[in-house]
Amino acid sequence: MSFPRAAANHPFRVLAVLLAAAVGVLLPGPRAAAAAGGPSLAEGTSVGIHNTYGDTAQFPFLADALDTGASLIELDTWVDPFTHEWKVSHANPLGNKNNCVDAAGPADLYRGGTNKDLGSCLDDLRIWLGAHPGHAPVMVKLELKAGFDATVGLGPAQLDALVRTHLGGAVFRPADLLGGYPSLDAAARAGNWPSRAALAGKVILEAIPGTFEQSNPFDHLWTDTEYAQYLNGLQAAGAIGQAQIFPSVLGAAAGDPRTRYPDASLRQWFVVFDGDAHAYVDGGVDTSWYDTNHYLLVMTDAQNVTPALSDTAPALADATARVARLAAAHASFVSCDWTGLPAVLGEQLQRGQ
């Protein structure tokens, strides 16, 4: 199904709330406001492509992947301490291997040399969205393969600066969800997400710990924790608006997986969760908890849920049914490698149904 476009913003909403408070009139909360413009970001399910940058046979250019209608792209990035760049590749920490180009306008998205850095990939996304203003919001999943390295000027603040430079106002930031609430958790549970229609053409970024980082016995400060600590610092400094990224809790687990963070003050920043679809669905995890609290849930490897489907080329009917099943299982975003099925990649479903 497709979602209707958002209704125009109402400049008198704040005044109305103040007047209502004065006279004791109960007004609709944020969820009702989102409903007026269609399902909120947390009330829908979209589909995206695992390692979107890497399949250059199917997608010679990143724009080709976006042309499928996908609403999630994944970019693996490495910090390069020698060039001070954010490299994009699956396995080379010192080189770029991807389908991103140096584009200055829409016509450049499908030509020129590839294998560019993260800034160029974000430029490609921004330019493509500018040419497709009605496109559903896109989740950019950043896997920081080896984590941050603030000691060489490649920490959370520098990544935020890069995002601001290359995506500008296209980003839906943590501060945009936060509003007047004391924490992201409180804002999410109150349903303060805008409608998906209102977020058309926007980007939401999540950051997860990388595979190399997780296997590094000398790395004791993973991406999720480091970025959450950074958010704590920004909030204390009254500068939370600088943050561009939502840190994500990685890995399916029963209950509230944020209890893994010993510093309880960090847990408030995690309203995005990311894990294996098979572990969530076949593992008996109560995923309704995420939906009830309006948290975003990214389910990866959709093909591995029982019964397993082809990794890359399932039948259209099977893939469509699988996405519907994961939407019913409360996924916000479904990640897969079904690059040849644009009818599936472009789906926008109601979450939890």
Predicted regions span which residues?
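C-terminal region of N-terminal signal peptides and the immediate post-cleavage residues
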Residues: 24-36
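Bacterial N-terminal signal peptides
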Residues: 15-26
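Alpha-helical protein-protein interaction elements
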Residues: 4, 18-19, 159, 222
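Catalytic cores of phosphodiester-bond hydrolases, prominently lipid phosphodiesterases
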Residues: 36-353
